[in-house]
Amino acid sequence: NTTFEEIICLLYDIELPNQERLDSMTARIGEARVLPEEIQKVITELAGKTSPMSTLRTVVSALGHYEKNVPLNELPPKALRLVGQIATAVAMIHRLREDLPLIEADPKRGHAEDFLRMLLGKEPSQTQIEALDLYLILLADHGFNASTFSARVTAGTLANLHSAITSAVGTLSGPLHGGANEKAMEMIIE
């Protein structure tokens, strides 16, 4: 009985939010789903020419251009922006690859709801929203997998946040990590 935004608050503040804090966090993530125009152009250029994960990896790296390097204690706002930005990028990549019209982010919606709306091009059902919230919560609690390890190694060198997440996305694309899910889905579809 929780949402992804509540878990983000828990990770961010080390405590569950009250309604005011939850509303504030939901709004901040929503605002972050609006991508810079230059990044939208990068996605449009690459989406049909490279794999989805290669496009996403490049986009995460390019998003780093818009962020200045900050001390470690100032990383949470950057990470929060990436949560919103990655959702929009993934939806755009999918829709461009399927030759579907793009759906603009709606910062007033919850994260799972807006991501599904941008991805599917229609209003998601409450069941779909709850399922995605649950999936995102499980991912937030995934612990120590290969992509997390990769991000930690990169961050451990004091590289910036976008470099660490770019490394994680690259690792996730491998057939023995996230790529395995892609192959399983292909088999299910066949």
Show the residue positions of the predicted features:
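Hydrophobic alpha-helical bundle cores within soluble ligand-binding/oligomerization subdomains
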Residues: 1-190
